Amino acid sequence: MLAQLKKEVFEANLALPKHHLVTFTWGNVSAIDREKNLVVIKPSGVDYDVMTENDMVVVDLFTGNIVEGNKKPSSDTPTHLELYRQFPHIGGIVHTHSRHATIWAQAGLDIIEVGTTHGDYFYGTIPCTRQMTTKEIKGNYELETGKVIVETFLSRGIEPDNIPAVLVHSHGPFAWGKDANNAVHNAVVLEEVAYMNLFSQQLNPYLSPMQKDLLDKHYLRKHGQNAYYGQ
């Protein structure tokens, strides 16, 4: 079942340690088949160096029940499922504890747009969610994490297709894309942007967002209706 999607998710998960986004098993990638409403995700707690395509777990988008697989799905599965349910255009999701993006999440700070590297991928500020409540933490924590992410985008009027990443307060980053590989790509860029911004704001604590015209130019030439740019 979903052999090609399993292969894509497996390879995307292997890309996380390759790009230094994870320590031990601190990360996961998933992808969705929208026609079948099925999600393929990394198994829980399996080391990357022994993981195989057959270890990937298939779960139902709406119930979270295992449809295929002999291992437990990632503990973050309910978060992934909530994002797929609420953000209908995304096809792949990545969660990591990559160092610099997690620093921003632990500080509870947004990553503002200050340079063209950011503008090439994110059409504005990368938001950090609010702190979760005691009730949310003690309840269905992973599902509530997804709901807090969705709430952040809705309450701030952010389009998830334009800002394909978020920082969960005191936790870490999630990134997404059109498929698993694209989601990993965005997670790599998020980590790089977090690193750049950390030092930029140390050098200039009064740093303000980049010019709107420059942000428009860099984002729209790559993602707009008349996109033309590629390196």
From Swiss-Prot:
User: Which EC numbers characterise this protein's activity in its record?
Assistant: 5.1.3.4
Q: List ligand-binding residues for substrate.
A: 27-28, 44-45, 74-75
Entries under InterPro entries matching the protein: Aldolase_class_II_sugar_metab (IPR050197), Aldolase_II/adducin_N (IPR001303), Aldolase_II/adducin_N_sf (IPR036409), AraD (IPR004661)
Q: What is its cofactor? A: Zn(2+)
Biological process according to GO: L-arabinose catabolic process; pentose catabolic process
User: Which cellular components does GO assign to this protein?
Assistant: cytosol
Enzyme class of the recorded protein, top EC level? isomerase
Instruction: Report keywords, A-Z.
Output: Carbohydrate metabolism, Isomerase, Metal-binding, Zinc
**What molecular functions are annotated in GO for this chain?**
aldehyde-lyase activity; L-ribulose-phosphate 4-epimerase activity; zinc ion binding
The record's free-text note on cofactor binding: Binds 1 zinc ion per subunit.
Record-listed Zn(2+) binding positions: 76, 95, 97, 171
Which Pfam family, just one, is annotated for this protein? Aldolase_II
Per the Swiss-Prot or TrEMBL record, the active site comprises: 120, 229
Q: What reaction gets catalysed by this protein?
A: L-ribulose 5-phosphate = D-xylulose 5-phosphate
Q: What does this protein do?
A: Catalyzes the interconversion of L-ribulose 5-phosphate (LRu5P) and D-xylulose 5-phosphate (D-Xu5P) via a retroaldol/aldol mechanism (carbon-carbon bond cleavage analogous to a class II aldolase reaction). May be involved in the utilization of 2,3-diketo-L-gulonate.
Q: Which NCBIfam families match?
A: araD (TIGR00760), PRK08193.1 (NF006047), PRK12347.1 (NF009002), PRK12348.1 (NF009003)
Question: Hey, which family's this protein in?
Answer: Belongs to the aldolase class II family. AraD/FucA subfamily.
Please report the name of this protein according to its UniProt entry: L-ribulose-5-phosphate 4-epimerase SgbE
What organism, scientifically named, is this protein from?
Haemophilus influenzae (strain ATCC 51907 / DSM 11121 / KW20 / Rd)
Write the gene name. sgbE
